[in-house]
A protein has these predicted regions:
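Core of compact, soluble alpha-helical bundle domains
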Residues: 3-169
């Protein structure tokens, strides 16, 4: 798996070990498939809404507004997040960004107006870690999910960083 990101894993990854070919089960399968992933995403999404730093009590006006005034959109967000996890975990479902961007997942445009700071991103990542622990996801799979999430930190925080750079100029 060296040199391969989570997003590049195929449904079944074939690796060579000791001269023999082994088929490794995809992260998608090890997580339990779409229904298990959807349960984790639903729990995680609800936890983020309740998180005092990044949810309804956030001091970030954009995050506060999203988590109070846009909750009718939460089921759709849970669906999109589920597709995203299934996709990056090597499952059969494909995530398609609702707004085009610099990468196939285009997270920078979806998050730009939220102005998510790096510290706020880390709080969301910690919430994801707690959710994975709640569901007793094994360490290997937990680490892979968190690595896939962390790989998009610069995209998600781009709006904050651009705003901070403009304010400093």
């Amino acid at each position: 798996m060296s040199g391969t990101s989570i997003g590049q894993l195929s449904h079944e990854e074939t690796t060579r070990r000791g001269g023999s070919t082994m088929t490794e089960t995809s992260l998608y399968e090890r997580l339990g498939g779409a229904f298990a992933i959807a349960a984790v995403v639903a729990h995680f999404s609800d936890a983020v809404v309740q998180n005092p730093i990044v949810g309804q009590g956030s001091e970030n006006p954009a995050l506060h507004e999203w988590h109070t005034k846009n909750l009718a959109r939460l089921p759709g967000l849970k669906f999109m997040r589920t597709l995203w996890v299934c996709n990056v975990a090597g499952g059969p479902f494909r995530y398609a960004a609702t707004k085009p961007g610099s990468t196939p997942v285009a997270l920078e445009l979806a998050h730009r107006e939220l102005k998510v700071s790096p510290a706020q991103f880390d709080k969301v990542a910690a919430e994801l870690g707690r959710t994975l622990d709640f569901f007793k996801v094994p360490d290997r799979e937990k680490d892979e999910v968190l690595a896939a999430f962390a790989a998009h930190k610069s995209e998600v925080t781009e709006g904050y960083l651009v705003g901070a750079s403009a304010a400093a100029a």
